Amino acid sequence: MAQFIDRRLNGKNKSAVNRQRFMRRYKEQIKESVADAVNRRSITNTETGEDVAIPHKDIKEPLFHQGKGGLRERVHPGNDQFITGDKIERPKGGQGGGGAGDGDASADGEGQDDFVFQISKDEYLDLLFEDLALPNLKKNQVNKITEWKKHRAGYQTAGMPSNISIVRSLQQSLARRTAMSAGKKRLLHELELELERIQNQEPAQKLEEMKLKQEIAELRKAIESVPFIDTFDLRFKNYERKPVPSSQAVMFCLMDVSGSMDQATKDIAKRFYVLLYLFLNRTYENVEVVFIRHHTQAKEVDEHEFFYSQETGGTIVSSALKLMDEIVKARYPVGEWNIYAAQASDGDNWADDSPRCKELLTNKLLPNCQYYAYIEITRRSHQTLWHEYEKLEESFDNFAMKNIRSVEDIFPVFRELFHKETA
């Protein structure tokens, strides 16, 4: 039974090349659809892809056609009703339009829905976080992390079975068999010609013929004894580890969980930080994340407790800033780490504590931070904390603050804060 082996590089995804070309061509429309999808689905839902809809008008291809008006003769196939000179009535079309339009239904009008297709989880996250980066990331020279990446470096005679190069091994086998048997094959050919000459000679020379046959048999046995492949022939792909220097960074996530933060505000803060957490883990391999929750007291927690703990209390923002400063001094020396922070709050704070927050940021944190982002989640007028932070924004280039009013503002604000700087 014949067997067909599919050696095409795309494997099961036979149309992968066409898909990639389509996504490159309509990248802007796809990115807009992905940005809209952020607000429709849970940010934590990253195990699945996303259905992307592109308006049909955006994917129309250019075409050549006759302009409107004018007189022209044309032969239409299948015409059995009209003759030259007849006037054709305009079709009665309804207002069928694209997708979910407000037009009336019509049996004759033709509408066109949006083009909808699904992108994978990786494609969704790639588009979501494209053009985003940690601002002001510097290559610190002290205790720089060194990543090792493997690169192909020829072949070697020993290695793991998974790294064996079949083609190169067979080439070595052919070369060895040719070298070991070429002389014997040449001698065998000469003896066979000699045997044929003796057999056709008169009178017969039986002793000489038997001697030649014995030599030929021994030569054939020697040629057949050459193994098809030997351990000497095996060649393995060789990989070398080359150092690739990279910067190490730590991101502090500070979130207010005081009693003034209602559940809707906490949900917005959680969504922002989940988005940030996914971005950091997907974009950078060497980024540590420190989670700090605070009310009247601040506490370093793990990821699960940061997002799902029900603990609450009053509001003293400076407690979180003090704890961050202590952690930086204890674990993240400024000369070795690029330090980033993102703080989320509803703006409520003990009035006497807001100047203290400004003082801590001015004297201790901002001089050591590459970037500090503050988001205030509120629809109300801003209070003392916002006004104190406005003074910081005027004095420090590495400090940014934004206001989030609703879920729809999360992704646009996130992109503004972490937009990749172009050279």
Curated annotation (Swiss-Prot):
Coiled coil: none annotated. Residues 93-102 have a biased composition (Gly residues). InterPro entries: UPF0229 (IPR006698). Residues 81-111 are annotated as: Disordered. Signal peptide: none annotated. HAMAP family: UPF0229 (MF_01232). Belongs to the UPF0229 family. PANTHER family: UPF0229 PROTEIN YEAH. This is UPF0229 protein VV2350.
